[in-house]
Amino acid sequence: MVCARHQPGGLCLLLLLLCQFMEDRSAQAGNCWLRQAKNGRCQVLYKTELSKEECCSTGRLSTSWTEEDVNDNTLFKWMIFNGGAPNCIPCKETCENVDCGPGKKCRMNKKNKPRCVCAPDCSNITWKGPVCGLDGKTYRNECALLKARCKEQPELEVQYQGKCKKTCRDVFCPGSSTCVVDQTNNAYCVTCNRICPEPSSSEQYLCGNDGVTYSSACHLRKATCLLGRSIGLAYEGKCIKAKSCEDIQCGGGKKCLWDSKVGRGRCSLCDELCPDSKSDEPVCASDNATYASECAMKEAACSSGVLLEVKHSGSCNSISEETEEEEEEEDQDYSFPISSILEW
């Protein structure tokens, strides 16, 4: 651009700067997106006014780019009404320089597109047998557990070797963790020596099934571990002197069941549907009635609003000496959901 002699110097400089700005803007024009959907359009806007080189420099497989430099209204219409931005250009066409993160590898799929798939490194695993995960499920080996963690459960860990057990017998917990059995007679390994931070808000308080208020889920887990048997969560918040379930508010779709034995309420899940299975073993409940299964017992409790617990397996009329010993132990046990120990 050549400025005419009669043009003021300030105006000429302003025009030069404007041209430079437009050149820079055109070089950067484009929008960066976090993924390309199955419909071929770009979705989840990351940043506007980026060049393709800048957008694709992250190495993320799903990052995509559109060349059009459009206004905010058009972007809004694309995202809300059109299923994403058209003319979507994926940053990666092959697996070259793709960073999938730990435990994943890039592979070309049947449509010849790069995809990150779970491929954990199992070369250093010495135990080849089944393992019990923190979710209470048995996995055929540790490698299968690592794949499950990669797919949908980032917090999943091996808690002990072997199949998940119903008692703490033959359970060898690693390190300083201790075995505790929950109300469904599933054995879990928990750690006793962890330091629990003081709660930052009153919303962290929990009322245990023992009628004691705990500062947080961590404090409840620690008390459970030190006690050596389950305490369990009655409801969220500080314990109150409730006269009935009407005084207790349950969240998360739970219903209050009244424990007449100790005069306290407990929030329990009541949305479980009992399957039609002939393999279920009957149970004798705390009301001295026999139910077709533990699930049927819970269903009856939710229907009546009165807490029922398993006294022993089998009919109430068939108590063996071994069952009586188990009953004495269970009478001292407070039931609790596994979330109160592991997932809080």
From Swiss-Prot:
Chain positions carrying an annotated carbohydrate: N124, N288
Domain (TB): residue spans on this chain: 30-103
Main location as per UniProt: secreted
Cystine bridges: C32-C55, C42-C88, C56-C91, C95-C106, C100-C116, C118-C150, C122-C143, C132-C164, C168-C179, C173-C189, C192-C225, C196-C218, C207-C239, C245-C256, C250-C267, C270-C302, C274-C295, C284-C316
UniProt signal peptide: 1-29
GO cellular component annotations of the record: cytoplasm; extracellular space; nucleolus; nucleus
Disruption phenotype: Follistatin-deficient mice are retarded in their growth, have decreased mass of the diaphragm and intercostal muscles. They also fail to breathe and die within hours of birth. Some of the defects are similar to those of the BMP5 mutant mice, which have defects in the thirteenth pair of ribs. Heterozygous loss of Fst is partially retained in a Mstn-null background, implying that follistatin normally acts to inhibit other TGF-beta family members in addition to myostatin to regulate muscle size.
Segments forming domain Follistatin-like: 94-117, 167-190, 244-268
InterPro entries xref list: Fol_N (IPR003645), Follistatin/Osteonectin_EGF (IPR015369), Kazal_dom (IPR002350), Kazal_dom_sf (IPR036058), Prot_Inhib_GrowthFact_Antg (IPR050653), TB_dom (IPR017878), TB_dom_sf (IPR036773)
Kazal-like domain boundaries: 112-166, 186-241, 264-318
GO molecular function: activin binding; activin receptor antagonist activity; heparan sulfate proteoglycan binding
Any Pfam family hit: Kazal_2
Gene Ontology BP terms: ameloblast differentiation; BMP signaling pathway; female gonad development; gamete generation; hair follicle morphogenesis; hematopoietic progenitor cell differentiation; keratinocyte proliferation; negative regulation of epithelial cell differentiation
Composition bias, Acidic residues: 321-333
Quaternary organization: Interacts with GDF11. Interacts with activin A/INHBA. Interacts with myostatin/MSTN.
Extra information: Induces muscle hypertrophy when injected into the tibialis anterior muscle with reduced response in older mice.
Protein's UniProt name: Follistatin
Species: Mus musculus (Mouse)
Lineage of the species this protein comes from: Eukaryota, Metazoa, Chordata, Craniata, Vertebrata
